[in-house]
Amino acid sequence: MKPTVFKTTNNNYYLYSPNKRRVIPISMHLYDAFLKNPSLILNDEFGAYLHDNGYLDEYQESYNGLIDESDIINALSNIPQIIFEMTSQCNLKCKYCCYNDCYTTFQNREEGVISFETAKAVIDFVASVCNDRNNSSVNSPLVFSFYGGEPLLYGDKIKEIVNYIKSKDFHNRVVKFSITTNATLIHKHIDFLAENQFAILVSLDGDSQHNANRVFHNNQPTFDTVFRNLKYCQNSYPEFFKTIRFNSVYTNASVTDEIIEFFLSSFGKYPTFSPLHEPQESQNAYIIKDLIKKIEP
């Protein structure tokens, strides 16, 4: 299938690129040139850009059901998100954590920390594929996310990685950053997070009663520490704080109205709720099963 041009009843002009699966606004001049001879649009700067970036390539349809090299290259060239698991280490020992011995899925998970060299190799590769002619996601977000464990245990390494990302060219992709955190260390890094406009998701189940399953390794509650840190961030960066989101795990102790009221009165926000997953049969699976409560319709 070859690219084609068309105009609307309002005299707006477009080119459809089947190779990129995109509709691109064009000028009347390019529209007329394309109708006369598609090669004529190469004399125009924007037309040359479309050619050089694969928008004018003919699309070869394939129905064999197989993924080939070009499919992989195209997908990687337009990848929307990269997630760095900074570490499998965590400074909490939440009673329902999917990495504890109540679940069997991750029992053989090894503790580790991502090296800067590994992150750099990933970033370099992403930059190279974003600059490939198959990239049709110009001006689309490219999100670099940081996960754990607790990623802020290695906050300085996150800063090193982010600074390297900011030094790279991703071919006009809109680079953004996000992080999921338990907020026990967020106060130490809020300046950096705010400066780089991180999208932050905080795991917090509600007030001290609802948050009782989120404990330190010594089984001490985390609520006071987390609440104090969040208030520090809210007071230090009130506008940025408005972008922070909260996720609450729904358990047998959850009272939805009370949780929502806590977040509204404390932070002016509504949380999202996540259910516990049914564990596979294991020696300690009953602990999770006792905590499970179906989210109310």
Feature names for model-found ranges:
Residues 2-15, 20, 44-83, 101, ...:
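N-terminal [4Fe-4S]-dependent radical SAM core
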Residues 1-20, 24-39, 289:
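Auxiliary Fe-S-binding modules of radical SAM enzymes
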Residues 214-227, 231, 235-297:
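Radical SAM enzyme [4Fe-4S]-AdoMet core and its adjacent flexible, acidic
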Residues 68-189:
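Conserved alpha-helical substructure of the radical SAM core
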Residues 160, 188-192, 258-262:
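A short acidic, amphipathic alpha-helical/loop segment
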Residues 103-104, 151-153, 183-187, 199-220, ...:
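Conserved radical SAM core fold
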Residues 194-200, 267-270:
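Glycine-enriched alpha-helix->loop->beta-strand junction motifs that scaffold or abut catalytic
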Residues 82, 142-144, 177-179, 200-202, ...:
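Hydrophobic faces of well-ordered beta-strands that scaffold small-molecule active sites
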